[in-house]
């Protein structure tokens, strides 16, 4: 799917160099097609890197996607130029009266921070409740899953004793589910989190359907029956070197991190790892866009039909 982005966004040239189909706003405006409107709430500090990762996964299907980037943390960023944020990101007040086909809420490095201490926790509440009336389907990733389970289902924050980091095998529980259509029976996906997602807790306290899980990671992929909410507790968007960068950052900071599981060749951090989850990530996002967004969203977004309580 050609993603439609502002002509000047740095991701345009970055992704084109990887042979990813990116359509600028100028070209897209000449096509008589309604693009899917997808809002990306980017909570990661290195926003440009995260943009590249998610836009790569949103790019491989035949329909246009009009990407809009959202920020809710107005503090000065130490990792992203203010010019970039001002040029390419919108504030919630700018979009609160608009409707969207899809919303993606990224992870955030807040695994050991209590929800009440998150600087933008009230804004997260506001966006999630706003999405009930204004978004066809929302996809939560990693920390955003934990936040959504707390806000929407009242599940307290669950924290692991040590950080889960590495590339893990997962098993499909419902092979005929739309979100896992085309998945291998077992597949690899990366994780990097302190958050814990016990499958039993989700089954006992929500009506969400779990589609994939792992003995080491817990629930990995689950969703609401009406397809309005989808949750992925890992990081299928990660580049091949993202876990490596996190490991070496923590090592150099003297944090004595564990070597990510099943990631570095021979468990040697000096050897360059290779991505073993790329096809899974592409298929997951394609399925979400097709079955949870495109197939159920109205042609005219003014005619939203919210079903969330």
UniProtKB/Swiss-Prot annotation:
<dbReference type="GO" id="GO:0008899">
    <property type="term" value="F:homoserine O-succinyltransferase activity"/>
</dbReference>
<dbReference type="Pfam" id="PF04204">
    <property type="entry name" value="HTS"/>
</dbReference>
<comment type="similarity">
    <text>Belongs to the MetA family.</text>
</comment>
<protein>
    <recommendedName>
        <fullName>Homoserine O-succinyltransferase</fullName>
        <ecNumber>2.3.1.46</ecNumber>
    </recommendedName>
</protein>
<dbReference type="InterPro" id="IPR033752">
    <property type="entry name" value="MetA_family"/>
</dbReference>
<dbReference type="GO" id="GO:0019281">
    <property type="term" value="P:L-methionine biosynthetic process from homoserine via O-succinyl-L-homoserine and cystathionine"/>
</dbReference>
<feature type="binding site">
    <location>
        <position position="192"/>
    </location>
    <ligand>
        <name>substrate</name>
    </ligand>
</feature>
<feature type="binding site">
    <location>
        <position position="249"/>
    </location>
    <ligand>
        <name>substrate</name>
    </ligand>
</feature>
<keyword id="KW-0012">Acyltransferase</keyword>
<feature type="active site" description="Acyl-thioester intermediate">
    <location>
        <position position="142"/>
    </location>
</feature>
<feature type="site" description="Important for acyl-CoA specificity">
    <location>
        <position position="111"/>
    </location>
</feature>
<feature type="site" description="Important for substrate specificity">
    <location>
        <position position="192"/>
    </location>
</feature>
<keyword id="KW-0808">Transferase</keyword>
<comment type="pathway">
    <text>Amino-acid biosynthesis; L-methionine biosynthesis via de novo pathway; O-succinyl-L-homoserine from L-homoserine: step 1/1.</text>
</comment>
<dbReference type="InterPro" id="IPR029062">
    <property type="entry name" value="Class_I_gatase-like"/>
</dbReference>
<dbReference type="GO" id="GO:0004414">
    <property type="term" value="F:homoserine O-acetyltransferase activity"/>
</dbReference>
<keyword id="KW-0486">Methionine biosynthesis</keyword>
<dbReference type="InterPro" id="IPR005697">
    <property type="entry name" value="HST_MetA"/>
</dbReference>
<feature type="binding site">
    <location>
        <position position="163"/>
    </location>
    <ligand>
        <name>substrate</name>
    </ligand>
</feature>
<keyword id="KW-0963">Cytoplasm</keyword>
<keyword id="KW-0028">Amino-acid biosynthesis</keyword>
<feature type="active site" description="Proton acceptor">
    <location>
        <position position="235"/>
    </location>
</feature>
<dbReference type="GO" id="GO:0005737">
    <property type="term" value="C:cytoplasm"/>
</dbReference>
<feature type="active site">
    <location>
        <position position="237"/>
    </location>
</feature>
<comment type="function">
    <text>Transfers a succinyl group from succinyl-CoA to L-homoserine, forming succinyl-L-homoserine.</text>
</comment>
